[in-house]
Swiss-Prot record:
Its main location: cytoplasm. It catalyses: a 1,2-diacyl-sn-glycero-3-phospho-(1D-myo-inositol-4,5-bisphosphate) + H2O = a 1,2-diacyl-sn-glycero-3-phospho-(1D-myo-inositol 4-phosphate) + phosphate. SMART domains: IPPc. It is found in: Cytoplasm, Cytoskeleton, Actin patch. Residues 133-161, 955-1183 are annotated as: Disordered. It comes from Saccharomyces cerevisiae (strain ATCC 204508 / S288c) (Baker's yeast). This is Polyphosphatidylinositol phosphatase INP52. The SAC domain is capable of hydrolyzing phosphatidylinositol 3-phosphate (PtdIns(3)P), phosphatidylinositol 4-phosphate (PtdIns(4)P), and phosphatidylinositol 3,5-bisphosphate (PtdIns(3,5)P2). Interacts (via SAC domain) with BSP1; the interaction is direct. Interacts with ABP1. The modification Phosphothreonine is found at T1032.
């Protein structure tokens, strides 16, 4: 494809395929604050005569969406790619190494190349480099063009950095992949071997990283008719991008040539860098969730096995500001349970039974996570251990501490039953029939789900792959050794996969990759791991914040970030009617809030908090409780540098016990601690389901931002469709330090950042509470005299000299904040255990240091007072509010939208599309003088002339002869091949593969090898590599549905099973391996297995009886067979076949029983299959 620009009448940009063009033009919409553009799918011929010309020399390999940056709309395209994988014949996977963003509503960036720093390339004389078509003989990549030009300082100052530069860097870093003929978002088992449509209806949006960019385009597509949808899907206009890893290597198993592929897909739902994305979110999505699939394809069989990884599905975080980041669990067991269950229900529906492999250490730093993990599993009423989920704890560090990483294979005996019961996906290529399906999945995790997880997933994958090879008698059990070439290549693939996942999450390659690649750990490998660890520490503290910002921008998760809206007359009508009918899908409700602040002065003794939390008993029961505590640890140098985070647990327990003394139960939804500051967020159990997007943040301001004795901890959440933010602060002390407190406030207000880059101003309701340390500016004697006299109006007289009241009234700080009427005595400073103000030598002036102020039109204060507690030198303060919150019924809103669309179409029949030639709502006016789009033009000169003839720029010189200008003359576009079939522009050469040293990879072919070429084929050329051209059948017919009513019998004679099928290849008889004989399999384990060092014994915990009513609903799944056999002469299906394992050897095997499964029907043979040529194999050895 190519990208064209026209400035006739209105500015338009078109992405043009061989037959159609997708035309975009900006729209100034009066009824929408969002950036809006119109899109039209038109036949290519309609672009003639509309002034279109090439906007870029680079071939467009895919359109990946629209995005708004800094008020500008950009069209995102793939302009550089290399072919890296071929999981099955005719299906290729490409790595993205270059993208371009073309501005739709501004001409500033037209015809410009951008350098690696994001600035336009300029020549030595200061002119900007204008893109010009290279000559046919030129194979220079974009980097060579840029290296031939230099930017002058003056020119750089004139031209700003490209707004999409950071996104270009992110998308071009080698971790993004796409395919034009293969659905990368689904596993091979789900996709199947039928002629699979690349329809967006079939894609798994969880792995589609350009989902935000394509959101409106997909909506536009869904409203088209079937013909138009097929055009968009099949012509490359809609491209799905995944992030992860994909690579294929080729090897031989005995004499059978095979392609070995690993594809990893990372979910974008909770995407981010290591310390910015931990645990689970409110929708049940976990950080670093990756689905990894290993595929083997040969001319005889296809095999696939899928595993998943993901962060522990509980709410936990780590403080990046510490050298040894502390693990903090931020939500209680009860509050976490619904989200925890939702996560596993989703996995169960998608993969079947889930076997958890927990690799966390039993050391104190990780043991709390393991304990919480098991507690959540046991408390689940929807997922039952031993039925839906299975847990194996394997302390990786302890198991490998003595015998090295080879001891990781000890995991296999512990999970053998699940390996046999879940099976693997296998397909008979020759006969075009499904043999087995995987039913179940291993979910592996460590702390980061990287290094330990990589090694265990590799170990499990090799064990299952060995099982497949033995079952299909492609290798003998004794011949499968680690020195085999294909085993070494598989190990190298897994090492590359681990490095790529680690690069995405941490910015460095994986630890232990030296062992993964070579099977042994050398001194250089250990030194490399130490270097990576130091690099990770630097990246975590100085780089990850910017990377997280770029990821959130790409995914549309920044505050108030919206998709580029596609103009649609119907959409305009619907939006107007939605505003008028908002009350039909929107409801409002009042909730009660209780907010408290207390400087506890390091107190660690239990006390009754009822007078603070329930000042009027059970007459007021809040829906939400937020408490801010200060000085939960003593403010000494030692305690500040080594904060005791166990104090948070002490206060959590004491507050929870007090809140739950009545019938209503409260759940802890968030705790945030920074040194001596702590904020607790509780909600009533029957209200917790309304709360989403809970997040926390901290900011240090003590000693210039170094220590946490002063600063802020904050939490935010959404209650329905209303957002709340609470900031608990401890500002600088001292009556004269007003400027320091102003600086603290501004520093906190600007720098508190929640997940997805939300900040304090982005919320509907704000609360600022804590020990604000504002004083009364009268003398100590004057204040105490007023407090002793208690004359009428003494509180108001003292408030006139209150620094905070003065600051708010002057608008210096806390702009827009209000404080309820203050009618209580100063809360600081008291003698401990009394109601007497400070009698020490310092004799502090009594002041209202402890305050609660608010901001929000939906807030109505009900009460504001102190509480008579005597456990600190401060008095606790509380405030009660009634908040009006909004709820949006999304289902009702969607129903209303559909009704409005139907209503509009009934009253405006002209808005309906009538066929493939009228695919858009409004056509551009077609000029009478139609100029052929592909006409050849002969022109001279080196200038690119603007269509409006207002400017001209000199094109940069390329290697070889001077390029011809890209001017639209009477003949149309230049740089077109003589046969008018394709533009004569060659893309940059792809990078050399890591495994195949030659410039082109050797493809899977039994008889011939042909190189992989990343350049799109020209018309008339074949796009099929060797395997497709010589040994691959045409797309196989659909596999018939399996039926439980007709169990498949395997009662075949020994001679039938041992007799090799024959195929004819050029007159030669080529025997095939015997089909595998299945084994019996035992059921999955009904226990929680916990590894014991140097032991294969598992401790068993009896699960509770299963509750049928609480079992998660799973779509009807027909059990598919998987054949697991070791000996062809064991034909009695009732007999238990087994593999013997010696517990003393990590490579040996215990008895692995299998259970019977059904066998699918065999469809009629495809005559094309008989044309396959395969390598000759010896007849099967029954022994």
């Amino acid at each position: 494809m190519k990208i064209l620009l026209s400035k006739q009448q209105t500015r338009k940009i078109a992405i043009v395929s061989e037959t159609h063009g997708l035309v975009f033009r900006p729209i100034n919409s009066k009824n929408s604050r969002r950036s809006t553009c119109a899109v039209e799918l038109v036949p290519k011929a309609e672009l003639n005569g509309n002034g279109f010309r090439r906007l870029s020399n680079h071939e467009i390999y895919g359109f990946i969406g629209l995005i708004e940056i800094e008020g500008l709309m950009f069209i995102a395209t793939i302009t550089g790619k290399s072919k890296v994988a071929q999981p099955i014949p005719n299906k290729t996977v490409n790595k993205i190494y270059a993208v371009d963003f073309f501005c739709l509503n501004n001409s500033k960036w037209d015809f410009m190349d951008i350098d690696s720093s994001g600035y336009p390339i300029v020549t030595n004389d200061g002119d900007f480099a204008i893109s010009s078509p290279p000559s046919i003989s030129t194979h220079s990549s974009r980097s060579s063009l840029r290296s031939s030009s230099s930017r002058s300082l003056n020119a750089q100052e004139q031209a700003p950095k490209h707004p999409c530069h950071e996104l270009r860097k992110l998308l071009s870093n080698g971790s993004f992949y796409y395919s034009t003929d293969f659905d990368l978002t689904c596993t091979l088992q789900k996709r199947g071997f039928t002629e699979h449509s690349l329809s967006f209806d079939d894609f798994d949006r969880e792995f589609m990283w350009n989902s935000f960019l394509m959101d409106e385009i997909i909506t536009y597509r869904d409203r088209l008719d079937v013909t138009a949808k097929e055009l968009l899907d099949q012509r490359g206009f809609l491209t799905t991008v995944i992030r992860g890893f994909a690579e294929t290597i080729f090897s031989y198993i005995n004499r059978l040539k095979v392609g070995l592929t690993i594809i990893s897909r990372q979910s974008w739902k909770r995407a981010g860098t290591r310390f910015n994305a931990r645990g689970i979110d409110d929708d049940g999505h976990v950080a670093n969730f990756v689905e990894t699939e290993m595929i083997m394809y040969s001319s005889q069989y296809c095999y696939a096995f899928t595993q998943i990884r993901g962060s522990l599905p509980i709410f936990w975080e780590q403080d990046t500001s510490l050298i040894s980041p502390k693990i903090q669990i931020t939500r209680s067991v009860e509050a976490t349970q619904p989200t925890f269950d939702e996560h596993f229900i989703r996995l169960f529906k998608k993969y079947g039974p889930v076997h958890i492999i927990n690799l966390l250490s039993t050391k104190s730093s990780e043991i709390q996570l393991s304990r919480r993990y098991k507690e959540q599993l046991k408390n689940s009423e929807k997922m039952k251990i031993g039925r839906d989920v299975f847990l194996t704890s394997f302390d990786f560090h302890r198991e490998t501490s003595q015998d090295g990483f080879a001891a990781a294979s000890r995991i296999i005996p512990k999970i053998r039953n699940t390996i046999l019961d879940a099976g693997y996906f296998s397909y008979d290529v020759k006969e075009g029939r499904l043999i087995s399906e995987q039913d179940g999945v291993f979910r592996t995790n460590c702390l980061d789900c990287l290094d330990r997880t990589n090694l265990i997933q590799q170990t499990i994958s090799l064990a299952v792959f060995k099982l497949f090879l033995e079952d299909f008698r492609l290798v003998k059990p004794s011949s499968f050794i680690d020195d085999n070439e294909f085993v070494q290549k598989v190990n190298a693939l897994w090492a590359d996969n681990g490095d790529q996942i680690s690069q995405i999450y941490t910015g460095t390659n994986a630890l232990k990759s030296s062992y993964s690649r070579k099977g042994k750990m050398s001194f250089s490998g250990a030194l490399s791991d130490a270097t990576k660890s130091v690099s990770r520490m630097y990246i975590n503290n100085f780089v990850d914040k910017g990377k997280q910002q770029n990821i959130d921008t790409l995914l549309g998760k920044l505050p108030h970030q919206q998709v580029v809206e596609l103009y649609d007359p119907i959409c305009e009508y619907v939006n107007e009617r939605l505003l008028e009918s908002e009350e039909k899908f929107t409801t409002h409700s009042n909730i009660n809030l209780f907010v408290g602040t207390f400087n506890v002065n390091g107190n660690s003794r239990r006390a009754d908090l009822s007078k603070w939390l329930f000042p009027i008993g059970d007459k007021f029961k809040p829906d939400v409780v937020v408490l801010g505590l200060q000085e939960v640890i003593e403010l000494t140098a030692g305690s500040i540098l080594n904060a005791d985070y166990t104090k948070s647990s002490f206060w959590e327990t004491m507050v929870t016990d007090c809140l739950n003394q009545y019938e209503e139960k409260y759940l802890l939804l968030r705790v945030e601690q920074m040194s001596s500051l702590l904020i607790l967020f509780f909600a009533r159990s029957d209200r917790a389901y309304n709360i989403k997007e809970v997040g926390g943040s901290t900011k240090k301001t003590g000693f210039g931002g170094i220590t946490g004795n002063k600063g802020a901890v904050a939490i935010r959440f959404d209650y329905g469709a209303t957002s709340f933010c609470f900031v608990n602060t401890h500002l600088s002390a001292g009556a004269s330090n007003i400027d320091e407190r102003r600086n603290d406030y501004n520093n906190i207000y600007r720098n508190i950042t929640f997940p997805r880059s939300k900040t304090i101003p982005h919320h509907d309701s704000l609360f600022w509470l804590g020990d604000l340390n504002y004083r009364i500016t009268l003398t100590n004697d004057e204040v105490r005299r007023e407090l002793r006299a208690q004359k009428d109006g003494y509180i108001d007289r003292l408030l006139q000299y209150d620094q905070l009241t003065q600051e708010i009234n002057e608008g210096v700080v806390f702009q827009g904040f209000k404080e309820p009427t203050l009618q209580f005595r100063p809360t600081y400073k008291y003698d401990y255990g009394t109601d007497n103000y400070d009698t020490s030598e310092k004799a502090r002036t009594p002041s209202w240091t402890d305050r609660i102020i608010y901001k929000g039109e939906n807030l109505h204060p009900l009460a504001y007072s102190d509480a008579p507690l005597k456990i600190s030198d401060h008095k606790p303060v509380y405030a009660a509010y009634r908040a009006n919150v909004k709820f949006v019924d999304e289902k009702e809103k969607l129903n209303l939208v559909e009704k409005l669309y139907a209503e509009y179409k009934n009253t405006h029949p002209e808005a309906l599309t009538t066929g493939p030639d009228e695919l858009s709502h409004a056509r551009m006016e077609k000029q009478k003088e139609s100029i052929p789009l592909d006409a050849t033009v002969q022109s001279a000169g080196i200038k690119l002339i603007d269509l409006d003839d207002t400017s001209s720029c000199v094109s940069p010189l390329l290697s070889g002869p001077s390029p011809q200008p890209s001017v639209v003359g009477p003949g149309g576009l230049s740089n077109v091949s003589p046969d008018k079939s394709k533009l004569n522009v060659l893309p940059p050469p792809p990078p050399t593969s890591r495994h195949n040293k030659e410039p082109s990879s050797k493809l899977l072919s039994p008889t011939k090898e042909i190189s992989i070429v990343s350049v799109s084929p020209r018309k008339g050329e074949s796009n099929l590599p060797a395997l497709e051209r010589h040994s691959t059948p045409k797309p196989l017919p659909p596999v018939p549905a399996l039926s439980l009513s007709k169990p498949v019998s395997l009662q075949k004679s020994s001679s039938e099973l041992q007799h090799a099928k024959e195929t004819i290849d050029n007159g030669k008889i080529v025997p095939r391996p015997c089909p595998p004989i299945r084994r019996k399999s035992s059921t999955a384990p009904d226990e929680i297995s916990t590894s014991t060092k140097n032991s294969g014994v598992s401790t068993t915990e009896d699960p509770e009886p299963a509750k049928a009513s609480t079992k998660p609903e799973k779509p009807p799944v027909v059990k598919k067979p998987h054949y697991l056999s070791v000996a062809a002469n064991k034909l009695n299906t009732s007999q238990e076949h087994s593999i013997k394992v010696s517990p003393s050897n990590s490579k040996s095997e215990e008895e692995l029983p299998c259970k019977k499964k059904s066998k699918p029907k065999v469809p009629a043979k495809n005559p094309e299959l008989e044309k396959l040529s395969v390598h000759p194999l010896k007849p099967c050895d029954p022994n």
